[in-house]
UniProtKB/Swiss-Prot annotation:
HAMAP family: Upp_B. GO terms for biological process: UMP salvage; uracil salvage. Catalyzes the conversion of uracil and 5-phospho-alpha-D-ribose 1-diphosphate (PRPP) to UMP and diphosphate. GO terms for molecular function: GTP binding; magnesium ion binding; uracil phosphoribosyltransferase activity. Transmembrane segments: none annotated. This is Uracil phosphoribosyltransferase. The gene is upp. It is an enzyme of class 2 (transferase).
Length: 208
């Protein structure tokens, strides 16, 4: 599995702001979008392009454009919605595929409850977004669903990843690519990433 910890100074700065105990909902939400945007820029650097001729202001001109059916962005409900707009800033024509997975707080196991994928999801690059890769259970369940639907090319974007989640994801789906803004120390006894960001979903939506 390709693992990329994107160490751009802007990303480091923004993740640092998100770690603050007193970060506001407004700021956390904006920062999640901004970091998602920066991760998207990195994750799409290898997209294949093709040369086409268009009518320019002064006659025909050759340009490059992304080749093929392009992209579907896959936010994992609900926290993944906080990163979705960051992807769409760069790829506004992307189809949106939504997967609902929540984590049972007692067993820490993923529980699927919703799936609505693009009709041609198997022909698209799937960019899966979720702020936290903790145990990896929710992400693995989501990738299982995508592959069952015919998805062949998948990139995962997360704000913060735990080593335990990375290891589990690599064991289950070694053929995908992972892009993260930070790889943190470990999971605590409750399955939260340390130092982490806290509950990203609650911070994005302003709930507790």
């Amino acid at each position: 599995m390709k693992i990329v910890e994107v160490k751009h100074p802007l990303i480091k700065h923004k993740i640092g702001l998100m770690r603050a105990a007193d970060v506001s909902t407004k700021d956390f939400r904006a920062l999640a979008t901004e970091v998602g945007s920066l991760l998207t820029y990195e994750a799409t650097s290898d997209l294949e392009t093709e040369v086409v001729t268009i009518e320019g202001w002064n006659g025909p001109v050759e340009i490059e454009r992304i080749k093929g059916k392009k992209v579907t962005v896959v936010p994992i409900l609900r926290a993944g919605l906080g990163m979705m707009d960051g992807v769409l800033e760069h790829i506004p024509s992307a189809r949106i595929s939504v997967v609902g997975i929540y984590r049972n707080e007692e067993t820490l196991e993923p529980v699927p409850y919703f799936k609505k994928l693009a009709n041609d999801v198997g022909e698209r690059l799937a960019i899966v977004v979720d702020p936290m890769l903790a145990t990896g259970g929710s992400m693995i369940a989501t990738l299982d669903l995508l592959k069952a639907a015919g998805c062949k090319q998948i990139k995962v974007l997360v704000l913060v990843a735990a080593p335990e989640g990375i290891k589990a994801l690599e064991a289950a789906h070694p053929d995908i690519e992972l892009y993260t803004a930070a790889i943190d120390s470990h999971l605590n006894e409750n399955g939260y990433i340390i130092p982490g960001l806290g509950d990203a979903g609650d911070k994005i939506f302003g709930t507790k």
